[in-house]
């Protein structure tokens, strides 16, 4: 089974690349989505409130990701503490899905993980595709998609590895500074060549 890690900074276009891969029959594992599910785990919620206080809780007992994000982004020590709580369970869930796909004879899997390098998940993949985009495009996407201010976007960008750091591990670099049609064609070609998909 071919396993590719799709990584890059926030707003770089990882999800778009994964959407195109899914259209080609690649199974997608979204690490952020798994992370959101991990936050629903009662034991994890308790550990998070022990560290960050009850202010991160919604009235229904779930974690308020917006408030939690404000508390950790821009504060490396806090973010590291949160990651130590959540990353082991996320990795465990990814590994479990990969094993399930292996058992089913799945040919190709892509793991969408912005923190693939930082979380130490490189061991889960055969190769890394790095998605990059100009900063101004990222600011625009995140303002439109998430309603984040420039300062909030910068805090998130600075909490992640730089593209230069990720580049050390990348087999493929996709510069998402093009039209959707061109990006889709690029992904189709890479899927054919690297994942042996027709």
Curated annotation (Swiss-Prot):
EC number: 2.7.1.24
EC top class named in words: transferase
Domain DPCK: 3-198
UniProt catalytic activity: 3'-dephospho-CoA + ATP = ADP + CoA + H(+)
Pfam families (alphabetical): CoaE (PF01121)
CDD domains (UniProt xref): DPCK (cd02022)
InterPro entries linked to this entry: Depp_CoAkinase, P-loop_NTPase
Gene Ontology CC entries for this record: cytoplasm
Residues engaged in binding ATP: 11-16
Origin superkingdom: Bacteria
Location(s) in or outside the cell: Cytoplasm
GO biological process per UniProt: coenzyme A biosynthetic process
UniProt keyword annotation of Transferase present: yes
The entry's keywords: ATP-binding, Coenzyme A biosynthesis, Cytoplasm, Kinase, Nucleotide-binding, Transferase
Keyword Iron on entry: no
Associated pathway: Cofactor biosynthesis; coenzyme A biosynthesis; CoA from (R)-pantothenate: step 5/5
Gene Ontology molecular function terms on file: ATP binding; dephospho-CoA kinase activity
HAMAP family: Dephospho_CoA_kinase
Family: Belongs to the CoaE family.
Function: Catalyzes the phosphorylation of the 3'-hydroxyl group of dephosphocoenzyme A to form coenzyme A.
Protein name, UniProt field: Dephospho-CoA kinase
Organism, as annotated: Dehalococcoides mccartyi (strain ATCC BAA-2266 / KCTC 15142 / 195)
């Amino acid at each position: 089974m071919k396993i590719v890690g799709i990584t890059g900074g926030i707003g770089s276009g990882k999800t778009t690349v994964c959407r195109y891969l899914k259209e080609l029959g690649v199974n997608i594992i979204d690490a952020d989505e798994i992370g959101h599910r991990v936050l629903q785990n009662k034991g994890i919620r308790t550990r998070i409130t022990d560290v960050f206080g009850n202010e991160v809780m919604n009235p229904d007992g779930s974690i308020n990701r917006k408030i939690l994000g404000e508390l950790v982004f821009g504060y490396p020590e806090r973010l590291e503490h949160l990651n130590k709580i959540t990353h082991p369970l996320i990795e465990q869930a990814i590994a479990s899905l990969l094993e399930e796909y292996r058992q089913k004879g799945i040919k190709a899997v892509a793991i969408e993980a912005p923190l693939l390098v930082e979380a130490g998940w490189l061991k889960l993949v055969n190769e890394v595709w790095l998605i990059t985009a100009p900063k101004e495009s990222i600011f625009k996407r995140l303002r439109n998609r998430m309603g984040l201010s420039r300062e909030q976007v910068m805090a998130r960008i600075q909490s992640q590895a730089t593209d230069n750091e990720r580049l050390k591990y990348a087999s493929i670099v996709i510069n998402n500074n093009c039209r959707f049609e061109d990006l889709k064609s690029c992904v189709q070609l890479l899927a054919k060549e690297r994942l042996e998909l027709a």
